[in-house]
Amino acid sequence: MSKVIGIDLGTTNSCVAIMDGSQPKVIENSEGARTTPSIVAFTDSERLVGQPAKRQAVTNPSNTVFAVKRLIGRRTTDAEVEKDKKLVPYAIVDGGNGDAWVEVRGDKYSPSQISAFILQKMKETAESYLGEPVTQAVITVPAYFNDAQRQATKDAGKIAGLEVLRIINEPTAAALAYGLDKKDSKTIAVYDLGGGTFDITILEIDDGLFEVKSTNGDTFLGGEDFDMRIVNYLADEFKKEHGVDLTKDKMALQRLKEAAEKAKIELSSSSQTEINQPFISMDKDSGTPLHMVMKLTRAKLESLVGDLIKRTMKPVQDALKDAGMSKGDIDEIVLVGGMTRMPKVVEEVTAFFGKEPHKGVNPDEVVALGAAIQAGVLQGDVKDVVLLDVTPLSLGIETLGGVFTRLIDRNTTIPTKKSQIFSTAEDNQNAVTIRVFQGEREMAADNKLLGQFNLENIPPAPRGMPQIEVTFDIDANGIVSVSAKDKGTGKEQKITIQASGGLSDDEIDRMVKDAEANAEADKQRKELVEAKNQAESLIHTTKKSLEEHGDKVDGSTVEAIELAVGALEEALKSEDAGKIKGGIQNLMDASMKLGEAIYKASQAEAGTGDAEGEAGPRDVDDEIVDADFEDLGEDKRK
């Protein structure tokens, strides 16, 4: 049975882990790094994922997609998407059903599809390490993701060729990794500030039982926002000094973004850093190049992002309130996500809880490790671990007057199922539309519409008489199914919620086929590169051998080798791996006689050497060296 892998699909970076014996282990990617940038780029000839995509972002900003997790499961009309459109250099467009998609080089991609490219890279990383195919995974999502975002993440897994056995909340995964070997009873708060999202989760841990008491957060608050504050500051300062607006230049903006991220990281360990960006623009009058050389202090950074850090504290307070706890009830605070390396974040958390956070986990890797543990639980490799998670937002339906009627309250332990009886609003009403919402507002329209369906052919009856039972069912992934049943006739209508846009099964199948086709194209491209490398190496060594040993074979053999070299050089121009491999084989066959001649010649030389060595016995005296010795005596020896 193949391994189930654990994947932390992050906004900025992603990470993959497996269970290695009784402990989870992070797997390094092909570049030797333990995390992979969640970036996908499209060039004229290929698709790049991870570090190669990040490296070329400055020169190809419009076709380099990053932070796509912020778009997953969202509509183009969402305020967050409108905000994102102004910040990113790539195009965010309507996918045709109101969903936010991205457009690159004239092609549209859903956020699930872009995420699938990243998941494929994670899958390949695991397969390369394990030496066997991987088909199943546990994937993490922010705890505060709604149903549409969870469903879209599951779709991404399917497109990548993975069966997603479980969607697990990131803070819960972190708690699993933190508490795996801990036997004592503790109440912990997981403060997770990542690249694009923020979560706070309160859990009770007791000898293998992990029970989530409450969760809260903000799915549009993270390191990307911190970076943009620095970018805007740098652009404003440059405009004041040179009168040039760098935000209008996509390439300059991408350079600023990279510089901002680097400066932010450096300021976690030093009090000052220099931002040096030569030739970032041109003076519009004189045409002379303009350079950015600027110092940024930690104090200035903290003043730029102070309100963002403060914003995390409201969800923390709400989570404690929902759990029925006070700050003093928390035994340990676990910090997760790269942004928790920032000293000001640690300072704010310490000030709020009145105690130092736990620093024993790697904030970049702990979520993937937890996902691997959950994978181990599902596979039966990890025993005595029970995880009880919660739904982050209330679920309900729209009733008369547009009111949001809750069926399942937020922070209800999942999986769960709940039913309620409703009736018709008018006499002889023969159909009802069930509109399903998720959120905390009192009016349905202010919450997130997850989907809708109709229950039809209700027998004519006075208003209030028919009994319609609406049942909500949330599985362990936090994904919702809703059914409506007319108790009089037994008629039932049921749906698994798909975002009011969402990807249809046909679209997912098309994307799966597209991903498979791309995987085949990638494989062929790799084969071509490897064949070219082998051919060039063989040509070089053959030519060198001919120069040194050509005189050891007859002229016809030399001519055959030179013809084979020429044919292989010609094949190299064709970009056809099959032709190149054929040329390699021909040259190897032609060179065989040369190899035999070289081998025979070296053997003959070795034989001659031995014969010379045995020509006569050496005079023993030849090896003797005369030397004078002085007797030190006892005193001198001391």
UniProtKB/Swiss-Prot annotation:
One of its GO terms (molecular function) is unfolded protein binding. InterPro entries: ATPase_NBD, Chaperone_DnaK, Heat_shock_70_CS, HSP70_C_sf, HSP70_peptide-bd_sf, Hsp_70_fam. Residues 603-638 are annotated as: Disordered. Induction: By stress conditions e.g. heat shock. The modification Phosphothreonine is found at T197. Residues 620-638 have a biased composition (Acidic residues). Keywords: ATP-binding, Chaperone, Nucleotide-binding, Phosphoprotein, Stress response. Belongs to the heat shock protein 70 family. Acts as a chaperone. This is Chaperone protein DnaK. The gene is dnaK.
